[in-house]
């Protein structure tokens, strides 16, 4: 089978995890990186050692001209908003900074329009949570969803001495106030299909050492509760390791003939 060619925007924790899996893991022999963009030149030096034939750039615009099958955005909400929807004219796109689709007014609908014309797809990985397949299956039957995210102070850049509720409210305001920490809320709302059904609660707790997400669902088909306690990436306390692995899994799925899950 022909290798999947990949353009990557963002060589941080998630991007580096994906590249490591291409080099010596579950994506080895299946995926070929053709371009890596990052605004920090020092991060690109390691990539150049790993993949001598892969182009690197500090200019985001170069990603749009890459000869790739898939573009993976793993940089920031700002980068995602800059790339979309135009990137869908050239590639399938995997977006990790899902908050951009909620925060930027009209961006999601513009992405849909471009995807319908070009046939390219916008992929939203599960990220740091599970249960998105259930939420998608229940679309139209959900009465309410509550997402509680609990993180240690270092993950939220807060200095608190006791468990503190930092925010409770809508998905859009949660993403606006915590853009680097709350892509989970955006992914949940996209799976549900109606952000107004989702209430987000963000808690800072000095007694915890891992990122925890609790999703509680009331629907006509049943009541559901998902709790995930995620270790952070060693070099990025704001990102759950499983979020990076979800990107790896989605890319791997693109190379396989059998797909498991909704």
UniProtKB/Swiss-Prot annotation:
The active site is at residue 213. InterPro entries: Asp/hSer_DH_NAD-bd (IPR005106), Asp_DH (IPR002811), Asp_DH_arc (IPR022487), Asp_DH_prok (IPR020626), L-Asp_DH (IPR011182), NAD(P)-bd_dom_sf (IPR036291). Pathway: Cofactor biosynthesis; NAD(+) biosynthesis; iminoaspartate from L-aspartate (dehydrogenase route): step 1/1. GO terms for biological process: NAD biosynthetic process. Keywords: NAD, NADP, Oxidoreductase, Pyridine nucleotide biosynthesis. NAD(+) binds at residues 128, 183. Its EC number is 1.4.1.21. It holds the Pfam family Asp_DH_C. Signal peptide: none annotated. It comes from the Archaea. One of its GO terms (molecular function) is aspartate dehydrogenase activity. It catalyses: L-aspartate + NADP(+) + H2O = oxaloacetate + NH4(+) + NADPH + H(+); L-aspartate + NAD(+) + H2O = oxaloacetate + NH4(+) + NADH + H(+). The keyword Coiled coil does not apply. NCBIfam families: NAD_NadX. Specifically catalyzes the NAD or NADP-dependent dehydrogenation of L-aspartate to iminoaspartate. The iminoaspartate product is unstable in aqueous solution and can decompose to oxaloacetate and ammonia. Belongs to the L-aspartate dehydrogenase family. This is L-aspartate dehydrogenase. It comes from Methanopyrus kandleri (strain AV19 / DSM 6324 / JCM 9639 / NBRC 100938). The gene is nadX.
């Amino acid at each position: 089978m022909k290798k999947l060619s990949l353009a990557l925007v963002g060589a941080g924790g998630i991007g580096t995890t994906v590249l490591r899996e291409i080099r010596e893991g579950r994506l080895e022999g299946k995926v070929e990186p053709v371009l890596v963009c990052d605004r920090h030149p020092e991060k690109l030096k390691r990539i150049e050692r790993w993949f001598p034939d892969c182009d690197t750039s500090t200019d985001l615009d170069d990603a749009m001209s890459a000869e790739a099958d898939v573009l993976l955005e793993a940089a920031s909400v700002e980068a995602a908003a800059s790339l979309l929807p135009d990137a869908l004219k050239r590639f399938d796109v995997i977006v990790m900074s899902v908050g951009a689709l909620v925060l930027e007014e009209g961006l999601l609908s513009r992405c849909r329009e471009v995807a319908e014309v070009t046939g390219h797809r916008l992929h939203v990985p599960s990220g740091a949570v599970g249960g998105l397949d259930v939420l998608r299956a229940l679309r139209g039957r959900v009465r309410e969803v509550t997402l509680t995210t609990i993180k240690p102070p270092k993950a939220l850049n807060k200095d608190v001495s006791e468990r503190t509720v930092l925010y409770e409210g809508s998905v859009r305001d949660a993403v606006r106030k915590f853009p680097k920490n709350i892509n989970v809320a955006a992914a949940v709302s996209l799976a549900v299909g109606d952000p107004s059904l989702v209430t987000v609660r963000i808690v800072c707790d000095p007694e915890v050492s891992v990122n925890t997400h609790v999703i509680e669902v009331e629907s006509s088909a049943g009541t559901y509760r998902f709790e995930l306690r995620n270790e952070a990436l060693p070099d990025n306390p704001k990102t759950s390791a499983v979020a990076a692995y979800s990107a790896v899994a989605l890319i791997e799925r693109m190379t396989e003939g059998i797909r498991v899950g909704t």
